Amino acid sequence: MVLEANLIKRHHPPYNILLRDDKSYPYLFIETGHGTPRMSLHRGAQKGKGHYFGPYPAVTALRESMVLLQKAFRLRTCEDHTFHHRSRACLQFQIRRCSGPCVGHISGEDYARDVADTIRFLEGKSDEAIRSLGERMQAAAEQLDFEEAARRRDQIAAL
């Protein structure tokens, strides 16, 4: 026991394999089990329908990653109960971290594309995600929807 403690202190391993602190590692979970997927932090068994990314060695690193992903892709993080009973846009929408699918500020198709781009990015296919955003930016510019084109440009710059 003492030898193990000394080795841990000396080498600072990134993961404590035995999880002696009774915690499980956090994962980024994109829940795709219903029409409007959400992004959340998840610990424990991977039973939910969706995509798990991780494990992260520290929950603070995961929370920082989630904030950056919210700024870039604007996926919702609210619980389903809150999502279904919302009558006006939330604070996350006001500070531009959510696209507002709960109150209809984004179409279902566009939100699904944002989810797909997020998953591609997290799977390491960032070139595909950026290409997809570029195509959507061009399409918005051709339709003279310059606000949407600027939003997509900002997403690309964030990545």
Indicate residue ranges for each PLM-predicted region.
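Acidic, glycine-enriched active-site microenvironments
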Residues: 1-159
